[in-house]
A protein has these predicted regions:
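Adenine nucleotide-associated cytosolic modules
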Residues: 1-249
Length: 249
């Protein structure tokens, strides 16, 4: 690290679990964030500020006025702009010493197959089950660690699936694919604005722990947050041997 980096990341360097070696791991890391909305708007800035060397941001949406209630990576002058380019502008201003890749495309199977294999950690900040299941399947296929978060109304959840370990459960073990499932969204159900910030920040924290290799990430655990009463519950996740996605791996 150069002198500017030593100063910028000095508060990390004081932490025994991070120190210079851990910070250098971050600077040499590449993370994929899928979704530049509410969760991504909290997750991406903390990863950028922490010094993750490369961040690939994927989203096909454009910023709308209704997004600004919670998506703090975007501003009034971002309305109508691509979310990933708005996000790239924000993150570059926050930390010009890292690289932000903006991919203005829908996260379909072909794109994810190309991107997932290039990164160390995949962070799911999307808002629908179809995409979450696709991200889960491709992360499993390539043996990547997946940090999954979701938030709607006053309820949210986060978990980590480490597909470097053959014994790891997957997202489908907890939420099996259901062709008859009716999607809900913030547009129809609403969302408590600070909640996406809490979960997105936790996603960033989990990713940093995994990249550096310290502490006890939420492996095999689902953390559930109720913002009405600030109640936090934790559920242990067991691998489902009959899971249609990971049951054979």
């Amino acid at each position: 690290m150069n002198d500017e980096q030593l100063l910028r990341y000095s508060r990390h360097l004081l932490l025994e679990d991070i120190d210079i070696a851990g910070q250098e791991k971050l600077l040499n890391s590449h993370v994929l964030i899928i979704g530049a909305g509410g969760l991504g708007s909290a997750c991406a800035p903390y990863l950028a500020a922490a010094g993750v060397g490369q961040i690939t941001l994927v989203d096909h949406d454009r910023v709308e006025l209704t997004n600004l209630q919670r998506q703090i990576m975007h501003q009034n002058n971002s309305v109508g702009m691509s979310k990933v380019w708005s996000g790239k502008r924000f993150l570059n201003n926050l930390n010009p010493g890292i690289t932000i890749h903006a991919i203005e495309q829908k996260a379909d199977e072909a794109l994810l197959e190309e991107l997932v294999m290039q990164v160390s950690v995949v962070i799911d900040c999307t808002d629908n089950f179809i995409t979450r299941h696709l991200i889960n399947r491709i992360s499993l296929k390539h043996g990547k660690t997946l940090v999954s978060g979701a938030s709607i109304g006053f309820d949210a959840q986060i978990s980590v699936f480490d597909f470097r370990q053959a014994s790891s459960p997957c997202y489908a073990c907890v939420f099996p694919p259901d062709p008859h499932f009716v999607e809900t969204s913030c547009a129809s159900m609403g969302v408590f604005s600070p909640l996406v910030g809490i979960i997105g920040s936790l996603q960033a924290a989990q990713a940093l722990q995994i990249l550096i290799g310290f502490g006890e990430p939420l492996l095999g655990r689902l953390l559930i947050w109720n913002a009405r009463n600030s109640q936090i519950d934790e559920i242990k996740i067991q691998r489902n041997l009959d899971c249609p996605v990971c049951g054979a791996h």
